[in-house]
């Protein structure tokens, strides 16, 4: 019976050996830097393909019709179909194909019959009777703010408000494309304002804490917050510059009237009051955000300069304290030197009288006091910091 049991165990041994061999290979691959780099590249490629699929050449998007209804939610459109159907250039879809959450550089590209908008995390193709919102149901437009944006976008495209009263005319006179662009700007500025409030609250709290005590952790938090404010300021500044460039180009503003171009009534070069007023309104909002962030960064910079002055002053005080201790030790060493000479086991004819000890002690004290006073006097001269000496000031006169 024992022999039979041993035979029944023998076939299981190769399975255990295979398992341990496989585990060893996996452990060896994970410890290999080249294998880890390959895994990282595959992961990044998989993430980048969430929006743009290079094999199928499709881009995920949501289409709104002329009535503001969501016609096709989260569909995949071919890249070449988008280019040929809507009169785009291949380079126009580069920003759309990126999978980053926030694109730092905003842009508004005006084409023959469409407007391609890329602001913060919103990328859309606006036409006179259609709006294509890229990646609307993907990883980026799944938050509460983006859901609110889609709801507000539908209301504006349908040309009605959320508090519309029956039997009362409450229509927006702006054309379809301007209502879509306005909704995108409103969502972008709302996101900027929300992010600004967070940065202001955090920065104000750190600055108030630094008024009571300066610690290493608080300085580290201040540095991190300053970096975040710099990125946010750059993002807001680029958005303001983009709107300002649009306002300076009269031909581009006239080309943004897609509905009138479709009706065969193109605008004159200087006849763009509606879109100009619309852009100026949001330019003022963005400019206010930029100025607020700039003032906060200026306050942080001023606080950093004051902290550096305080730390430099404390460091100088510590250095002066160390110098005073060194001066005291030097003076004491001078008196000890006199005493050591007196205490040598040599004939010096001073020991024969009774005045030797008082004389040596007096000389040691006098030497110690002289060295201390002389060193402290020169130290006080070094403490007095002047912009220019009397001789230089007299020559400058």
From Swiss-Prot:
Q: Where is this motif: YGMN?
A: 342-345
Q: Which residues cross the membrane?
A: 318-338, 355-375
Q: Where is the transit peptide?
A: 1-48
Q: Which GO terms describe its cellular component?
A: mitochondrial inner membrane
Q: Does the keyword Transmembrane apply?
A: yes
Tell me the membrane topology, using the record's own terms. Multi-pass membrane protein
Family named by the database record: Belongs to the CorA metal ion transporter (MIT) (TC 1.A.35) family.
Protein name stated in the entry: Mitochondrial inner membrane magnesium transporter LPE10
Which species?
Kluyveromyces lactis (strain ATCC 8585 / CBS 2359 / DSM 70799 / NBRC 1267 / NRRL Y-1140 / WM37)
> Corresponding gene?
LPE10
